[in-house]
Amino acid sequence: MLRCVYTDLDGTLLGRGASLFRDADGLFTLLPARALEACFRANVEVVLKSGRRKAQVMEDARLIGQTAYIFEMGCGLVIDGEETMLTGDLQPANGKTVHDLIEESGAPKLLLDTYAGRLEYHDPWHLNREISHLMRGLVDSDEADRLLEEHGLGNLRLVDNGAIAPKGSLPDLEGPPHVYHLIPRQASKADAVARHMRARGYSPEECIAVGDSREDVGVAAVVGRFFLVANAVEKDPDVMRGVPANVEVTEGRNGDGFYEAVVKALAER
């Protein structure tokens, strides 16, 4: 029996312009809303898992009538108003946020200097964040993690959160830019999802997840089925590299793919 759907926002539930009511091409659609309605009628919880700031995800969760959500790439989890920070040893203290502590470590400067012309802050969405440093460009995140480790910053990692539209400020990239989050190594969407499942008493077989990035695919390890929306593969074919057997690619893009995943999972429950 399906009891919970974990879904990413941008590039998954949301369409062009980050709208619930626009598809990948910008046309009006009700399919994502209908999928949410189907979940409501079937008593299935929907949990948003996003790289967005807490304030943004909180409002999005309220808009769809849900009381649990995951923010800043799994760095934080809120269940029925109770917040849990999942950032390991990096915790807010003495008036400083985790974002401040990461800044003081020198890690953001190291990455931006090393990958100058290939990596920059994701302006303006990098502002007013409490945990992750938000960047865009095109780098090998595994290589970046090794660089951090070599400089004594192995408690952090650079997370690839999927491809975005080209940016004029990065004209020399060899492919479409990606969004990256510099976060504590212990944090992940998969860990946050697993913690929510334990809190609610859900088994993996009772849960599915939907997403469009490599970090989203990591959630496949803790749920019964994972649906990768078609636009993820279109933008970044490498996202399919080494995926587990329970990952399926939808025919639809963005919210159409979310609808497809929900309807399929409900029909087979």
Predicted regions and their residues:
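Active-site phosphate-binding/coordination module
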Residues: 27-124
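Basic, amphipathic juxtamembrane/active-site segments
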Residues: 17-38, 228-230
